[in-house]
Amino acid sequence: MNYIPCMITIGNFICGLLAIHSLLYHNIHSAVLFIFTGMFLDFFDGMAARKLNAVSDMGRELDSFADLVTFGVAPSMLAYSVALYTLPFIGILCALTYSICGMLRLSKFNIEQSKLPTFIGMPIPFAGMCLVILSFTYNPILLAIGTCGLSYLMVSKIKFPHFKKHAAENLESGRWN
Protein backbone atom coordinates (compact mmCIF):
# COMPACT_ATOMS: atom_id res chain seq x y z
CA MET A 1 0.00 0.00 0.00
CA ASN A 2 2.97 2.34 0.52
CA TYR A 3 3.44 2.60 -3.24
CA ILE A 4 -0.04 4.06 -3.89
CA PRO A 5 0.85 7.74 -3.20
CA CYS A 6 3.87 7.49 -5.53
CA MET A 7 1.68 5.92 -8.22
CA ILE A 8 -0.74 8.86 -7.90
CA THR A 9 2.21 11.26 -8.22
CA ILE A 10 3.48 9.38 -11.28
CA GLY A 11 -0.03 9.74 -12.73
CA ASN A 12 0.33 13.52 -12.26
CA PHE A 13 3.72 13.38 -14.04
CA ILE A 14 2.23 11.37 -16.91
CA CYS A 15 -0.57 13.94 -17.24
CA GLY A 16 2.04 16.69 -17.60
CA LEU A 17 3.90 14.72 -20.27
CA LEU A 18 0.67 14.00 -22.13
CA ALA A 19 -0.25 17.70 -21.97
CA ILE A 20 3.10 18.57 -23.58
CA HIS A 21 2.61 15.82 -26.18
CA SER A 22 -0.86 17.19 -26.97
CA LEU A 23 0.61 20.66 -27.50
CA LEU A 24 3.14 19.28 -29.99
CA TYR A 25 0.14 18.24 -32.08
CA HIS A 26 -1.74 21.53 -31.44
CA ASN A 27 -4.40 19.78 -29.40
CA ILE A 28 -5.00 22.60 -26.92
CA HIS A 29 -8.13 21.19 -25.29
CA SER A 30 -6.52 17.81 -24.54
CA ALA A 31 -3.52 19.61 -23.04
CA VAL A 32 -5.80 21.56 -20.71
CA LEU A 33 -7.66 18.38 -19.74
CA PHE A 34 -4.37 16.65 -18.88
CA ILE A 35 -3.17 19.63 -16.81
CA PHE A 36 -6.40 19.71 -14.80
CA THR A 37 -6.35 15.92 -14.37
CA GLY A 38 -2.79 16.26 -13.05
CA MET A 39 -4.06 18.91 -10.64
CA PHE A 40 -6.73 16.52 -9.38
CA LEU A 41 -4.11 13.79 -8.81
CA ASP A 42 -1.77 16.28 -7.13
CA PHE A 43 -4.49 17.10 -4.61
CA PHE A 44 -4.77 13.47 -3.52
CA ASP A 45 -1.17 12.17 -3.51
CA GLY A 46 -0.18 13.86 -0.25
CA MET A 47 -3.48 12.95 1.37
CA ALA A 48 -2.98 9.31 0.38
CA ALA A 49 0.58 9.36 1.73
CA ARG A 50 -0.58 10.67 5.11
CA LYS A 51 -3.56 8.31 5.29
CA LEU A 52 -1.40 5.26 4.43
CA ASN A 53 1.47 6.43 6.65
CA ALA A 54 3.68 6.47 3.54
CA VAL A 55 5.11 10.01 3.68
CA SER A 56 8.70 9.88 2.39
CA ASP A 57 11.52 12.04 1.06
CA MET A 58 11.29 10.16 -2.24
CA GLY A 59 7.58 10.93 -2.50
CA ARG A 60 8.25 14.61 -1.86
CA GLU A 61 10.91 14.71 -4.58
CA LEU A 62 8.70 12.84 -7.06
CA ASP A 63 5.91 15.31 -6.30
CA SER A 64 8.20 18.25 -7.12
CA PHE A 65 9.30 16.70 -10.42
CA ALA A 66 5.70 15.97 -11.37
CA ASP A 67 4.60 19.48 -10.38
CA LEU A 68 7.38 21.06 -12.43
CA VAL A 69 6.27 19.20 -15.55
CA THR A 70 2.49 19.50 -15.07
CA PHE A 71 2.29 23.03 -13.62
CA GLY A 72 5.59 24.58 -14.74
CA VAL A 73 6.47 23.35 -18.22
CA ALA A 74 3.07 22.34 -19.65
CA PRO A 75 1.25 25.64 -18.84
CA SER A 76 4.13 27.74 -20.17
CA MET A 77 4.10 25.71 -23.39
CA LEU A 78 0.32 26.16 -23.56
CA ALA A 79 0.66 29.93 -23.15
CA TYR A 80 3.33 30.01 -25.84
CA SER A 81 1.28 27.79 -28.18
CA VAL A 82 -1.92 29.85 -27.97
CA ALA A 83 -0.60 33.42 -28.03
CA LEU A 84 2.95 34.11 -26.84
CA TYR A 85 4.41 32.77 -30.10
CA THR A 86 3.23 36.01 -31.75
CA LEU A 87 5.79 37.92 -29.65
CA PRO A 88 8.93 36.27 -31.08
CA PHE A 89 11.61 37.01 -28.46
CA ILE A 90 9.44 38.26 -25.60
CA GLY A 91 7.05 35.30 -25.83
CA ILE A 92 9.72 32.62 -25.45
CA LEU A 93 11.41 34.66 -22.72
CA CYS A 94 8.13 34.84 -20.75
CA ALA A 95 7.51 31.10 -21.14
CA LEU A 96 11.06 30.23 -20.07
CA THR A 97 10.93 32.64 -17.12
CA TYR A 98 7.70 31.05 -15.87
CA SER A 99 9.18 27.52 -15.99
CA ILE A 100 12.43 28.62 -14.35
CA CYS A 101 10.60 30.46 -11.56
CA GLY A 102 8.45 27.37 -11.04
CA MET A 103 11.59 25.25 -10.68
CA LEU A 104 13.10 27.75 -8.22
CA ARG A 105 9.86 27.89 -6.23
CA LEU A 106 9.68 24.10 -5.91
CA SER A 107 13.33 23.83 -4.89
CA LYS A 108 12.93 26.55 -2.28
CA PHE A 109 9.76 24.89 -0.94
CA ASN A 110 11.53 21.54 -0.52
CA ILE A 111 14.43 23.12 1.35
CA GLU A 112 12.79 25.78 3.49
CA GLN A 113 9.12 25.55 4.18
CA SER A 114 7.29 22.29 3.71
CA LYS A 115 6.00 22.38 7.32
CA LEU A 116 4.89 26.03 7.51
CA PRO A 117 1.14 26.80 7.82
CA THR A 118 1.27 29.16 4.81
CA PHE A 119 3.12 29.11 1.51
CA ILE A 120 5.84 31.67 0.91
CA GLY A 121 5.32 32.49 -2.77
CA MET A 122 2.43 31.33 -4.93
CA PRO A 123 2.20 27.52 -5.12
CA ILE A 124 2.99 26.24 -8.60
CA PRO A 125 -0.29 24.28 -9.04
CA PHE A 126 -2.25 27.49 -8.43
CA ALA A 127 0.06 29.47 -10.73
CA GLY A 128 -0.36 26.77 -13.38
CA MET A 129 -4.15 26.92 -13.11
CA CYS A 130 -4.04 30.73 -13.41
CA LEU A 131 -1.80 30.53 -16.48
CA VAL A 132 -4.07 27.98 -18.17
CA ILE A 133 -7.10 30.21 -17.58
CA LEU A 134 -5.20 33.32 -18.68
CA SER A 135 -4.13 31.53 -21.88
CA PHE A 136 -7.72 31.48 -23.04
CA THR A 137 -7.76 35.25 -23.37
CA TYR A 138 -5.70 34.63 -26.53
CA ASN A 139 -4.24 38.11 -25.95
CA PRO A 140 -0.43 37.95 -26.28
CA ILE A 141 0.25 41.21 -24.40
CA LEU A 142 -2.06 40.34 -21.50
CA LEU A 143 -0.67 36.81 -21.44
CA ALA A 144 2.95 38.06 -21.42
CA ILE A 145 2.20 40.40 -18.51
CA GLY A 146 0.27 37.68 -16.67
CA THR A 147 3.02 35.12 -17.22
CA CYS A 148 5.63 37.50 -15.82
CA GLY A 149 3.36 38.39 -12.89
CA LEU A 150 2.79 34.73 -12.01
CA SER A 151 6.53 34.09 -12.33
CA TYR A 152 7.22 36.85 -9.82
CA LEU A 153 4.51 35.65 -7.43
CA MET A 154 5.96 32.13 -7.34
CA VAL A 155 9.38 33.37 -6.14
CA SER A 156 8.10 36.27 -4.03
CA LYS A 157 8.03 36.45 -0.23
CA ILE A 158 4.24 36.96 -0.28
CA LYS A 159 2.35 34.55 1.99
CA PHE A 160 -0.41 32.45 0.45
CA PRO A 161 -2.91 30.33 2.42
CA HIS A 162 -2.37 26.59 2.44
CA PHE A 163 -5.81 25.71 0.98
CA LYS A 164 -4.80 22.21 -0.11
CA LYS A 165 -3.54 21.32 3.36
CA HIS A 166 -6.69 22.61 5.09
CA ALA A 167 -8.99 20.99 2.54
CA ALA A 168 -7.14 17.68 2.86
CA GLU A 169 -7.32 17.79 6.67
CA ASN A 170 -11.07 18.49 6.53
CA LEU A 171 -11.64 15.78 3.94
CA GLU A 172 -9.58 13.25 5.91
CA SER A 173 -11.44 14.02 9.14
CA GLY A 174 -14.82 13.91 7.41
CA ARG A 175 -15.76 17.49 8.28
CA TRP A 176 -16.15 20.62 6.16
CA ASN A 177 -16.40 23.86 8.12
Curated annotation (Swiss-Prot):
Family matches, as Pfam families: CDP-OH_P_transf (PF01066)
Taxonomic lineage from the root: Bacteria, Bacillati, Bacillota, Bacilli, Bacillales
Annotated Gene3D superfamilies: 1.20.120.1760
PANTHER family: CDP-DIACYLGLYCEROL--GLYCEROL-3-PHOSPHATE 3-PHOSPHATIDYLTRANSFERASE-RELATED, CDP-DIACYLGLYCEROL--SERINE O-PHOSPHATIDYLTRANSFERASE
Localization, UniProt: Cell membrane
GO MF assignments: CDP-diacylglycerol-serine O-phosphatidyltransferase activity
Name of this chain's protein: CDP-diacylglycerol--serine O-phosphatidyltransferase
NCBIfam families: pssA (TIGR00473)
Main location: membrane
Organism from which the protein derives: Bacillus subtilis (strain 168)
Cross-referenced InterPro entries: CDP-alcohol_PTase-I, CDP-diaglyc--ser_O-PTrfase, CDP-OH_P_trans, CDP-OH_PTrfase_TM_dom, CDP_ALCOHOL_P_TRANSF_CS
PROSITE patterns reported for this sequence: CDP_ALCOHOL_P_TRANSF
Keyword DNA repair: no
Reactions catalysed according to its record: a CDP-1,2-diacyl-sn-glycerol + L-serine = a 1,2-diacyl-sn-glycero-3-phospho-L-serine + CMP + H(+)
Membrane topology note: Multi-pass membrane protein
Record keywords, A-Z: Cell membrane, Lipid biosynthesis, Lipid metabolism, Membrane, Phospholipid biosynthesis, Phospholipid metabolism, Transferase, Transmembrane, Transmembrane helix
Keyword Membrane: yes
Enzyme class: transferase
Enzyme Commission number: 2.7.8.8
Disruption phenotype: Cells appear normal, no effect on flotillin cluster numbers or size.
Family listed: Belongs to the CDP-alcohol phosphatidyltransferase class-I family.
Encoding gene (name): pssA
GO cellular component assignments: plasma membrane
